[in-house]
Structure formats: structure tokens, C-alpha cells
């Protein structure tokens, strides 16, 4: 596969990705239907153009040997998680979620008020995605 060329993911590979976490989004753990699943690249394709310089060469090599679309680089994702992760790798996505949640709890008047009235409870996120909890339990 040439660098920058996006090769469609086969139905068989999509099924393997879906089965990886038994029909759950690898990030939030929500149950998803096969037709709703989006296939996320752990190391984003966009890193070849927009990512950190040290990752760009790694992604170019992944295009050459086609490992960019290998099962080890693919995760089942719900639409919301795939959209929110965007072109981030796992660590940047994790940090983005943590900082957004912390910011919302500190800065949003509505959130603080809802917490004050017991409408919502703040439980600090352990920073682990669904797939990481699954790997720990297996």
C-alpha cells in the first residue's frame, strides 16, 4: 500500500475488530451494534501528516508494510469516542478526557450546582479505558 493511500477495511477484518471486545467500544465500554461500530486506528493515519515528527516516520513505515490496518492497530469504537479521539493517539486522548472532565467540574456553574444538589456525583476517572480494564481482567 502506498503512503497516504487509504485501503478499505474488509468485512472479515471489521468482524475481527468487533469481536476483539465482544461488541463493546474499546474506549468507553458501551455496547455497540456491528453496523454502528467505527474502526479506530490506535496509531492514527493522520500522524503521517499532522502528528508529532517522531511518529510520522513510524506511520509511513506502517503504510509500507500494511500494518496500519493490522488488527493490533485497530479498535472498535462508538461514534462519539472515535469522533472525540480524532487524530490523537491513546495517551493524548486520555489526557484530553482527563483535562476536559477536570475543567468541566471546576469551571461549569451548572456542573458545580448539580454536584452541590446531589444530582450528579463526581467520581474521579482512573484514567483507564475499557480495553485496558479488560486486559487486566484476562
Residue ranges and their predicted role:
Residues 15:
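Active-site phosphate/pyrophosphate- and oxyanion-stabilizing loops and adjacent acidic/basic residues
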Residues 18-23, 70-74:
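Short metal-coordination and nucleic-acid-contact micro-motifs, chiefly zinc-binding Cys/His arrays
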Residues 1-12, 30-32, 57-58, 62-75, ...:
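Extended charged
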Residues 38-44:
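Histidine-centered catalytic micro-motifs used for acid/base chemistry in nuclease
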Residues 48-59:
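Charged, often glycine-rich, active-site loop that binds/positions anionic groups
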Residues 33-34, 45, 49-50, 84:
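Short, charged/polar surface micro-motifs in flexible loops or helix N-caps
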Amino acid at each position: 500500500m502506498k503512503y497516504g493511500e487509504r485501503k478499505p477495511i474488509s468485512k472479515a477484518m471489521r468482524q475481527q475488530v468487533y469481536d476483539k471486545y465482544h461488541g463493546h467500544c474499546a474506549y468507553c465500554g458501551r455496547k455497540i451494534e456491528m453496523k454502528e461500530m467505527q474502526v479506530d486506528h490506535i496509531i492514527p493515519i493522520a500522524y503521517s501528516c499532522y502528528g508529532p515528527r517522531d511518529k510520522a516516520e513510524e506511520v509511513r513505515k506502517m503504510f509500507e508494510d500494511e500494518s496500519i490496518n493490522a488488527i493490533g492497530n485497530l479498535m472498535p469504537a462508538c461514534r462519539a469516542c472515535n469522533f472525540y479521539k480524532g487524530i490523537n493517539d491513546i495517551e493524548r486522548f486520555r489526557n484530553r478526557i482527563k483535562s476536559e472532565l477536570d475543567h468541566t467540574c471546576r469551571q461549569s456553574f451548572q456542573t458545580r450546582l448539580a454536584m452541590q444538589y446531589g444530582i450528579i456525583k463526581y467520581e474521579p476517572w482512573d484514567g483507564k479505558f475499557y480495553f485496558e480494564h479488560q486486559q487486566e481482567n484476562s
